Amino acid sequence: GIRDVERSRALGDVYKRQSDYCMYCLGWNYSNGEGVEQNMTEAIRWYTAAAEGGNADAMHDLGWHYDHGEGVEQDMKKAICWYERAAEQNHPAAMNSLGECYAMGRGVPRDLETAMEWYRRAAELGEAMADYNMGWHLEQAGKLSEAYAHYRKAADGNDDSAWWALGRFYENGVVVAQDGKEARRCYETGEKLGSVKCKMRLARCKLLGIGGRREKKAGLDLCRQALELAKESSEKEDYGYEAEMNLLRRTIAENES
């Protein structure tokens, strides 16, 4: 009867969603070399199949590959299209990615107001990176208390760059009382999460004795190592990255004699 037809349709929908998710997982495995040899062509093939089937994670990841030209030729039109389709399904990372595109004028006209709106929506859904991005733009606009609040929220969500931002605020006494020990703790936390910017700052802290004992020789070695690592890092596109490298270069030069 009608109920049997409805049940069959519902089951069909479940199977389809599971199938789309499995295709997404295959794409992710090929993209990251997890359990299989890394193969970007296969990754894109499976991401595309899953995205066309309606999987929002696949839509976002496929958009990211088109955005960054990884495994496919860079195509910002397709990147924006897939980000938007994922965002329509309330995918927080896709909303954040759209925010980044509008903030940088990548594939769309630069529009900071629209960028901040996408960041806000993503942050409300728990996307820590969106809180960090909002914090950065608020900091650049001189709204330091608001920036600090977003950095703190992002750090609570384990965003590594947010720990770098908080460390700078404590190191320089911005909005909060100057506290070298707390600055160093922030950098240590961010470094453990993989932040190269935190690694650069932490090396500098050890060399200059910020928040702890000064270790000139060991500090210099750490600074040089951090700088070499920074040159090769995929973080290079991050806000403030070039300025951090320049600060570390200056610190090394001033302390080598």
Regions found by a protein language model. Give the residues of each.
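Hydrophobic face of amphipathic alpha-helices that form TPR/SEL1-like repeat modules
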Residues: 23-32, 59-68, 95-104, 131-140, ...
